[in-house]
Amino acid sequence: RMAFNIVARNQDDHVKNIAFLMDKTGSWSLSPAFDMTYSYNPTGRWTGTHQMSLNGKRDDFTIDDFTACEKAIAMQRGRGLEIMQEVQDAVTQWPAFAAEAGVPAETADQITLVHRTGI
C-alpha cells in the first residue's frame, strides 16, 4: 500500500486509512485496502504532501528509501524492489483503466503526468 500510495499519488495516506482485522481465534491481519485513490494537489493543505513518511521523507523519494524501509522491517532482501516494480507496472496501465472507466482523457492525462513511475 505504501508503494502504491507513493507511485499513484494517494497523498491522503494517513493512519485512519490503514486498518486491521481480528478473526475468531484472535489472529490479526491487514484489512482489505480502502480509500486508495489519486489525491494530489500541490497547493492543497492536506494533499500537497504525503501524510505518512517513508524513510523520514514525505516527497522526493528514491529507490534507496524503499531499500531502507525493506531493511527496517526485516523484509526479505530484494522483495521491496519487487513490490515497487509490480506497483509501477500496474500504475503505468492507468491510461487504459481510466479510458475503460470513462475518465475524461484530459483528466487522465493530468494524473498520468504526476504519477511516480520512474522511481
Spans of model-derived segments:
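Anionic ligand-binding catalytic core segments
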Residues: 1-119
